[in-house]
Amino acid sequence: MLSLLVASGLVLAACGQGGSSDENKNDSEQKANTEQKQKGDTSGTSETGKNSNVIKLGDIKTQPEDAVKTAKKEYDGELKEISFEKEQGKWAYKIDLQKQGEEGEVIINSKDGKVMNKSTEKEDDYDKAKSFKYEDFKPYDEIIKKAKDNFNGDIHEWSLSRDSDEGKFVYDVDLQKGNSKQEFSLDAKTAKILKNEKDD
């Protein structure tokens, strides 16, 4: 009787170990699969994250002159500043227009050229010297290429406006490659680099 109980105990123990071994094996496989999946997800996320911060010159769909035309249909003012940046999670042009006593801002989606947002506000410091026509200056793609000759990154943002310190119209360009960022200021008439700084 005692030997039968011992034998039963051994069989149960063996079954328990066998089951446990299989469970461990399954757990290990599941864990490995989960880790692999997470690794895949992480790399996808970081890739997407990286891409969402910058845009390649060739991927910009709407040209600045078209964005300005669209903005002027929405608000009848003189062009004061144009900038290209991430707005509400989308690449967009922010067009600032001015007229006596008022300023307007129109945001244009770069992907489809449609208006995302527009606003106006009372403004007393109207300054005719800050108004310009985009076509009077070097096109933005020429400016970006000049900056890229010095630092081969993708576009993080750029803008064109009158720089009061320089006393002239200037393109400000931010390029990014990985974690490195470079900021440029270029003369809008000549494309001469006025400033080139590493942004840490």
Regions found by a protein language model. Give the residues of each.
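Short secondary-structure transition/capping segments
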Residues: 125-135, 165-172
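Sec-dependent N-terminal signal peptides
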Residues: 1-7
